[in-house]
Amino acid sequence: MTKENICIVFGGKSAEHEVSILTAQNVLNAIDKDKYHVDIIYITNDGDWRKQNNITTEIKSTDELHLENGEALEISQLLKESSSGQPYDAVFPLLHGPNGEDGTIQGLFEVLDVPYVGNGVLSAASSMDKLVMKQLFEHRGLPQLPYISFLRSEYEKYEHNILKLVNDKLNYPVFVKPANLGSSIGISKCSNEVELKEGIKEAFQFDRKLVIEQGVNAREIEVAVLGNDYPEATWPGEVVKDVAFYDYKSKYKDGKVQLQIPADLDEDVQLTLRNMALEAFKATDCSGLVRADFFVTEDNQIYINETNAMPGFTAFSMYPKLWENMGLSYPELITKLIELAKERHQDKQKNKYKID
């Protein structure tokens, strides 16, 4: 059987660099190597692109994926053809954060006309920018918690007024978030104005724009969505925390988080969550995969928190686990995403790019 040619891209110039490498290790060890000829491209923290061809063995440590040595090649050379000498059937970007899931690298793949897994330019960019995402949800009529947003330059000029606005409009605790970052990096839970100032200072280290959201005493529920024009959603899962806040450290290092799949919710609430996840997917014109995150209060009030265009994708992450609960294994999910990438690219070929 002739193998399909796949290129996995990971690393990246982002604070989520190490998360991306961990994800790549998991995917490389699970992908069907009888079906796919797999090359990898590692993007260093400095932005250099380094390639390794034909991965056939188990990756036992993320250290094996730090391809720091070797010549940094031109991007167009790297993606022109696979090490088998044939064009790539699909590129699988496993990049998190800015320069990875914000539409920038998706734009590169579009220009090079390469099929790629996951969301397109618009959906990736709008899902990454928390303010734009919230505005799209609002337009779609999806319920959200109160929030405000402002720029670093505005805060430097109008700090007193902005702090007053937060105190007038929101109740503590509040969450301060960089607008364009994931994996809970740069996010702070603030219970008073002193903590608020520190949280703002922390968030502005990662982005020029931030969002401050009203805190709520609620369960954190997540739904996985898969597909292109006709997506499907899983039954919800719950993030059960042994910490006050589900931050980067508790997500990836401490093991203080457990996933309950499916979540213990009334069936009508679960159905509402599935439908809202599909609405959120459509609101940002997504394709491939999305994880929709919600808050559910004790009296079953539902608020959408965000969509994640490149959700955590290790074997133990919520997104693959939700699909595993639906009967789709991790290796099968990887194959399905590659098929969806090819399907979307084939559909794009129906477009006309010149007028006769």
UniProtKB/Swiss-Prot annotation:
Positions contributing to Mg(2+) 2 binding: E306, N308
InterPro entries noted in UniProt: ATP-grasp (IPR011761), ATP_grasp_subdomain_1 (IPR013815), D-Ala_lig_Van_CS (IPR000291), D_ala_D_ala (IPR005905), Dala_Dala_lig_C (IPR011095), Dala_Dala_lig_N (IPR011127), PreATP-grasp_dom_sf (IPR016185)
Positions bound to ATP: 167-222
One GO process term, biological-process aspect: regulation of cell shape
PROSITE patterns: ATP_GRASP, DALA_DALA_LIGASE_1, DALA_DALA_LIGASE_2
Gene: ddl
Binding site for Mg(2+) 1: D293, E306
Database matches in Gene3D superfamilies: 3.40.50.20, ATP-grasp fold, A domain (3.30.1490.20), ATP-grasp fold, B domain (3.30.470.20)
Entry's Gene Ontology cellular component terms: cytosol
Key words of the record: ATP-binding, Cell shape, Cell wall biogenesis/degradation, Cytoplasm, Ligase, Magnesium, Manganese, Metal-binding, Nucleotide-binding, Peptidoglycan synthesis
Domain ATP-grasp stretches: 134-339
UniProt key word Cell wall biogenesis/degradation: yes
Enzymatic reactions: 2 D-alanine + ATP = D-alanyl-D-alanine + ADP + phosphate + H(+)
EC number: 6.3.2.4
Main location, first listed in the record: cytoplasm
Similarity field: Belongs to the D-alanine--D-alanine ligase family.
Role of this protein: Cell wall formation.
Protein name: D-alanine--D-alanine ligase
